[in-house]
């Protein structure tokens, strides 16, 4: 077991940034659930509008990318890359542009 490759994941700081944005989506009533998946190639934080649906967003940390600008990505339900960047904070600004007003 000691010879197996270390499983990649989000760092504590990365997860805190993602959960901060996720919390705003939850507070606004736009998002309902999330899931975290990890492999040797990538770690994915999936955001769901309803638990029984496909994720509406996937925040992806690419562990095997040769290009630095492909380290982080946001993908839509269809798998289209919405935004890509080497910096997670900059990438998450995409969600700050979204309207997270509270729903009455």
PLM feature segments, named:
Residues 16-17, 28, 68, 74-76, ...:
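Intrinsic structural disorder
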Residues 1-6, 81-104:
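Mixed-charge, Lys/Arg-enriched low-complexity segments
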Residues 3, 54-81, 97:
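Short aromatic-glycine-(Arg/Gly/Cys) micro-motifs in beta-strand/loop hairpins
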Residues 1-44:
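Negatively charged, low-complexity tracts enriched in Asp/Glu with abundant Ser/Thr
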């Amino acid at each position: 077991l000691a010879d197996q490759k270390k499983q990649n994941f989000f760092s504590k700081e990365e997860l805190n940034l993602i959960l901060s944005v996720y919390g705003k989506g939850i507070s606004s009533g736009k998002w309902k659930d999330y899931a975290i998946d990890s492999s040797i190639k990538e770690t994915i934080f999936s955001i769901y509008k309803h638990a029984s649906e496909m994720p509406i967003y996937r925040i992806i940390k690419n562990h095997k990318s040769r290009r630095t600008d492909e380290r982080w990505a946001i993908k839509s339900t269809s798998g289209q890359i919405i935004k890509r960047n080497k910096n997670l904070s900059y990438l998450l600004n995409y969600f700050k542009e979204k309207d997270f007003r509270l729903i009455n």
